[in-house]
Amino acid sequence: MEEALIQWQERELTQTGHYYKHICWMVVPLLWMSCYFYGPRPLLLCGVAWLVGNLCDRLISLLRRRVYQPKDYSNESFALIIALLMPATVDWYVLVAAVLAGVLIGKEVFGGYGSYPFHPAAVGFVVAAVSWPEQVFRYPQPYASIPLWDASGVAVSSTISDTLRSGGTLNISTLSLGLGEYAAPMGTGAALVLVACGLFLWVQKDIRLSATLSFLITSAVIVFLFPRQVGLDNGPLLMNLAFRLRCVRDELLTGAMLFSAVFLLNEPYTCAHHRLGRILYGVLMGVVTVGFRYFGVYETGVCFALLVVNSISGWMDRTETHLYALLHSRKNAGDTAGKEGAE
């Protein structure tokens, strides 16, 4: 059984391994922006995350007595995603614990490459978020001086989350939101860079627009119709059009929404595989994510929503396959009956 699993994983690696390699490359521009805002510490954090993910891969290969696959970048990609979801001031032990949880609990416990039902990076982030919320959800301001090793003395805040949760609007220009010039996780703020990364991954056929766009459109529609800003939900729709659009901007460009649409949603083994299933997957992600943002206690509710929807993505695939087979069997039966009647 173990030998059959290893052979299956090797075949899958040849088909989907490029996805994780491209994800690692797309981390580079986000990391460059993060270093521009926060200094060299993000580079060191990502380096440690990469090293921990790689060492876990080698250790598991040794324990399971299988050959280490140097072309398998899945652990490293999960580790880098977790690092980019963290603030630049996060303590080292929190980052290491998150990567270990994501790689070992989120991936290897279920059998390793391609066998996991939940996105390992989301698993690692959620474990850290629940265990150390004061470390994960409080962010330094851009251009702050952050020491390389001990960042405990740096001023941090959760202004964005507090403002939106209290029904206020962000006093941040669209350009600043697009560039990521606000307190946020170190790799999720630069919306313009994220769009460019998404376009590259789409050209490489690593992400599917059916899941990404349905997620973003669903989230935008819910926020537009039911904004949490004070007073907007009571006034006429057209009278508050500009303010509602601003609410959509604030919600989609904060809270790692765009980052998740590019780097988390289209993971090959946790996303639905058929087009209709991916659309439904994205719609459910949008509904559950906005629900977590509106009524949850954590700013980056999208990772919690991802785990919820991952639990039924396989069921959506199976349901679509059965419906497709049923419809085509009826169509074929009708065609056969028509031919017999004509004869």
Model-predicted segments: where are they?
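C-terminal ends of transmembrane helices
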Residues: Q7, L55-V67, V103-G114, A196-K205, ...
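Long hydrophobic alpha-helical segments that form multi-pass transmembrane helix bundles
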Residues: S115-V195
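Loop-to-transmembrane alpha-helix initiation sites
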Residues: P117-A121, R249-M257, R278, G296-V309
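Structural signature of hydrophobic alpha-helical transmembrane segments
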Residues: G39-L51, T89-A98, L177-A191, F243-M257
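Membrane-interface helix-loop-helix junctions at boundaries between adjacent transmembrane segments
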Residues: P70-N75, L80-A151
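N-terminal signal-anchor module of multipass membrane proteins
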Residues: M1-S61, G338-E343
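Cytosolic-side transmembrane-helix boundaries in multi-pass membrane proteins
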Residues: M1-K21, F292-E343
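Hydrophobic, membrane-inserted alpha-helices
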Residues: M26-M33, G53, D57, N75-L84, ...
